[in-house]
């Protein structure tokens, strides 16, 4: 069995360099919610050094609230902003001898695109316009995954090690209780259940079906590195290969 392990990087966390030794894919902030040109360049350099797949992590224009503010923007605006961000990272990667492999939206752009078909279409269209060979990463079973498939893109369905789930397979909003799983054992058990059995127990007790092709590790948690190491060790014990 194989699984991709991804982390959001270039967002000002001190653990970026170490996380890049543990993950197989890196989602690099493109300046709209965090990061800048030099940080993007540094992240790409480290990803290439560690053999980690390079991906763009575009966001709504929201540095003030780290890309977590809900926005209602016209689809054409989202299309242009997404194209702008992924184009910038693709060029930075190419300038250093690397290749951008995937795109994963950030924060509220990701969450809204999981449910809003027009927004999902704008993102998928931008990815396709930039490079039809790019992989589009989105929440398992979401509108974004459906939009990607409609454009003929390779999609990668994502699950979260440290996030609570609702009965419909969507994430518990960060503003609600149960959104984040602080208990390491619970997060490990949830991850294995999703990867090995394709299901997750919701905060209300029902089982939701999920397709786990990539697991997100948040690099901004207090114990992010320790958990990443434990997860890698657990995958090795279960003979689950980590690869992009």
Curated annotation (Swiss-Prot):
Which InterPro entries would you find in this protein's record?
A: Glyco_hydro/deAcase_b/a-brl, LamB/YcsF/PxpA-like
Task: Return any one Pfam family short name.
Answer: LamB_YcsF
Hydrolase listed as a keyword = yes
Q: Which domain of life is it from?
A: Bacteria
A single GO BP:
carbohydrate metabolic process
What GO MF annotations does this protein's record show?
5-oxoprolinase (ATP-hydrolyzing) activity; ATP binding
Q: Does the keyword Transmembrane helix apply?
A: no
Q: What is this protein called?
A: 5-oxoprolinase subunit A
Species of origin reads Shigella sonnei (strain Ss046)
Its encoding gene is what?
Answer: pxpA
